[in-house]
């Protein structure tokens, strides 16, 4: 029991130590310099996301398996729809698509006061939709986002359930947002499944 508990403590200390300095620097840089905030955000996405899984694997025996062989069969650019199971899903995609520019559709609350995450989402221009936006407003956000990601050769990622599942089962698929993003980006669609 002590060994299991101690490994959790060590993992938390490592994770906290890893994210604290970049998070604080990005909070300071965001209002002052977009260029520096972009550099810090890129570091968080490209360096810290893979390290997160290394720490979890080392101390908690958490393993990530992705079908990397399937990437060679995909077109150069596409959009992704996926189920949404946990708070690690975004980091999973960052790890799997290491080196590619990916952008998420998220609720705007994540763009405010969430350490490490908020400045990255705002600086990299992810699609932050107000929770209480009218349907037409939400569709407008998605249309602009789809066009922007296609022009910048970025991979837009949408969780059409709209939120994380509470029990591991796939939730209701909201197709209107998917259709608008697909139409505005003009990109082929890749369906991903997250499990575990």
Label the model's feature ranges.
Residues 1-78, 91-92:
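Membrane-anchoring hydrophobic helices of lipid-metabolizing enzymes
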Residues 61-196:
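Soluble catalytic domains of membrane acyltransferases
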């Amino acid at each position: 029991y002590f060994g299991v508990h101690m490994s959790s403590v060590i993992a938390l200390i490592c994770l906290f130590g890893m994210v604290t300095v970049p998070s604080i620097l990005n909070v300071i840089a965001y209002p002052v310099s977009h260029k520096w905030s972009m550099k810090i955000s890129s570091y968080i996405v490209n360096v810290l996301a893979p390290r997160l899984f290394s720490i979890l694997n080392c101390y908690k025996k958490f393993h990530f398996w992705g079908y990397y062989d399937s990437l060679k069969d995909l077109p150069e650019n596409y959009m992704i729809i996926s189920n949404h199971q946990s708070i690690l899903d975004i980091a999973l995609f960052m790890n799997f698509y290491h080196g590619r520019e990916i952008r998420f559709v998220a609720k705007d609350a994540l763009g405010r006061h969430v350490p490490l995450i908020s400045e990255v989402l705002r600086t990299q221009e992810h699609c932050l939709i107000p929770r209480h936006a009218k349907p037409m407003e939400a569709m407008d956000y998605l249309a602009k986002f789809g066009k922007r990601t296609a022009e910048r050769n970025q991979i837009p990622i949408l969780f059409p359930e709209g939120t994380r599942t509470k029990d591991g089962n796939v939730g209701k698929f909201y197709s209107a947002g998917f259709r608008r993003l697909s139409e505005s980006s003009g990109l082929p669609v890749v369906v991903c499944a997250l499990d575990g």
